Structures are given as C-alpha cells and as structure tokens.
Design a protein with these regions (language model features):
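Bacterial N-terminal signal peptides
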Residues: 6-16
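Primarily recognizes the serine-hydrolase "nucleophile elbow" in alpha/beta-hydrolase
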Residues: 117-161
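Sec/Tat signal peptide C-region and signal peptidase I cleavage site
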Residues: 17-21
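Serine-hydrolase catalytic machinery in alpha/beta-hydrolase-like enzymes
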Residues: 27-129
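Positively charged n-region of N-terminal signal peptides that target proteins for export
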Residues: 1-4
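Short beta-strand-initiation
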Residues: 23-25
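A periodicity- and composition-biased signal for non-globular, repetitive helical segments
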Residues: 8-9, 76, 155
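Generic anion/oxyanion-binding catalytic loop in active/binding sites
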Residues: 10, 102, 106, 149
Length: 161
C-alpha cells in the first residue's frame, strides 16, 4: 500500500512539473523619479510567437504573492503577464490602515502613479514574446480601480478586467 501511495505521488508531481515546464518567471527592476520598482514577469517559454500581454495591478496591500500568482496563471493560459509595482521600494501593508495610506497616496499623486503604470506597460510591450498591439490590464481592489482609471484616461489597452 505504501508503494502505491509513493508511486501515486511521484506520478502526480511529474504531471505538475510537466504542466509548468515552459513557464518562466523573472523579477524586473525599473524605477521612476528615483523610486525603485520591482515587477514580476511570467510567460510560457515553450510557445513560439507573439502573444497578448497583460498588466496585473496589485491590491491595496502592495506587490505581493497574490499578484505574482495571477501573472503565473495568465502565463499558463498563454499570455505574457507583468505584475507591476505601484508603490515601490518593496512597500507591503499588513494592516488595512496602512494599505489605505498607500492607496490614498497613489491616488493623491495620480500623475506619478500613471507614470509608474506606463513605465511597466512599456517594459511589457518591449518583451520578446509580446504583441505590443494587444495589451490588457487586470486588477483587484486598488488594482481594478487603477486599470479602469488608466483605460478611461486613454491608455493603449485592448481589454480591462
């Protein structure tokens, strides 16, 4: 019985490994007005040709694993995704009060936030796997508001979720 269990686990893990074999991820460092920003790029390296790019805008907590995992999921679905960093300098909130402060600061200085978003979009558009004419943006909470605000402001986006 133990051998069957171990064999089952090995087979299951091999399927998981094969499913993610072509997914490449990398941290992308960039800056705006002296603030260090760190994005997270994910794409399927086993596929050839250009594909749509998707900007993933984090929640009000900051650039965390949730946004990175969404980028990986999008890569598995055939997109190239960049989870961008709207706050910079590794800012992460662990309490709603702090998250609200970060979010309010981003919206209070919208031109700066818009420039950070556009900087990330430029990086995504230049990636070797991306069809720069097919860019979308998704976000959750704060990120959804940013995506919509950018689209309404005329950003070069084909889709917003």
């Amino acid at each position: 019985m133990k051998k069957i269990f171990v064999l089952s686990v090995v087979v299951l893990l091999s399927f998981v490994t094969l499913a993610n074999a072509g997914i490449k991820t990398e941290e992308i460092e960039y800056s705006h007005n002296g603030t260090k920003l760190t994005g997270y790029l994910a794409y399927d390296d086993s596929k050839s040709g250009k594909r749509p790019g998707v900007l993933v805008v984090h929640e009000w907590w900051g650039h965390n694993d949730h946004a990175r995992n969404r980028a990986k999921m999008l890569a598995e679905a055939g997109y190239t995704a960049l989870a961008l960093d709207m706050y910079g300098s590794g800012k992460l909130a662990n309490h709603p009060k702090k998250a609200g402060e970060f979010m309010n600061a981003a919206f209070s200085n919208w031109p700066d936030s818009q420039a950070r978003y556009n900087k990330a979009m430029g990086i995504l558009k230049e990636h070797k796997t991306v069809d720069a004419t097919r860019i979308g943006s998704i976000g959750f909470c704060f990120g959804g508001a940013v995506s919509i605000k950018m689209a309404r402001g005329g950003a070069d986006l084909k889709a917003v979720v």
